[in-house]
Swiss-Prot record:
It comes from the Bacteria. Disulfide bonds: none annotated. Keywords: Cytoplasm, Elongation factor, Protein biosynthesis. CDD domains: S1_EF-P_repeat_1. Belongs to the elongation factor P family. Pathway: Protein biosynthesis; polypeptide chain elongation. One of its GO terms (cellular component) is cytoplasm. The gene is efp. This is Elongation factor P. GO terms for biological process: peptide biosynthetic process. GO terms for molecular function: translation elongation factor activity. It comes from Pseudomonas syringae pv. syringae (strain B728a). Involved in peptide bond synthesis. Stimulates efficient translation and peptide-bond synthesis on native or reconstituted 70S ribosomes in vitro. Probably functions indirectly by altering the affinity of the ribosome for aminoacyl-tRNA, thus increasing their reactivity as acceptors for peptidyl transferase. Pfam families: EFP, EFP_N, Elong-fact-P_C. It is found in: Cytoplasm.
Length: 189
């Protein structure tokens, strides 16, 4: 059992016998009212999203999820097929099931992901916190602009855009932090 104040992004709770992923949790305490937790939840089985406000003392059921290592095997339209690295079983997910990691999923990637199962059904995939991707396009460096941390837009092979350091060029391998939508960490070593 969890209480409302223990909710944080990534936590999975049970509501009406379905697993719900906490995507956002905002704790609020005012002088007059009791503490509350405003949450954005996603049903892991149906993809339905909702917002619910919990009291800090509300009791919520935990969900036991199984996790296995998996790699992306191939992409066919909006269907992504992942392979369990231990027994080579194939599992399919739609693009909407993995929309939070979709900007960093690309054909031929070798990253080992964490496949998340609820009652033997694949419900989502989590990427490692740091991944390496190649810059497909970026503008040239701005000469003389060295007053601070200078960033410029760049595009990855799958079309994802993010800000990178000014010295990054086309073809460079960069590290990306996949938490909170993804951000540039540095040049890959």
């Amino acid at each position: 059992m969890k209480t409302g104040k223990e909710l944080k992004p990534g936590t999975v709770i049970r509501l009406e016998n379905d697993p719900w992923l906490v995507q956002k949790a905002e704790f609020t305490k005012s002088g007059r009212n009791s503490a509350i937790m405003k949450t954005k939840l996603k049903n892991l089985l149906t993809g339905y999203k909702t917002e619910i406000v919990y009291s800090a003392d509300d009791k919520l059921d935990d969900v036991i999820l199984d996790r296995k290592e998996a790699t992306l095997s191939f992409i066919s339209g909006d269907t992504y097929t992942f392979m369990d690295t231990s027994d080579y079983t194939m599992y399919e997910l739609n693009a909407e099931d993995i929309e939070s990691v979709l900007p960093f999923v690309e054909e031929g990637m070798t990253d080992v992901c964490e496949a998340v199962f609820f009652e033997d059904r694949l419900v989502s995939v989590e990427l490692p916190t740091t991944i390496v991707r190649q810059v497909d396009y970026t503008e040239g460096s701005a000469r003389g602009d060295t007053s601070g941390k200078v960033m410029k837009p760049a595009k990855l092979k799958n079309g994802t855009e993010l800000s990178v350091a000014d010295f990054i060029e086309i073809g460079d391998m960069i590290e990306i932090d996949t938490r909170e939508g993804g951000s540039y960490k540095g040049r890959a070593k």
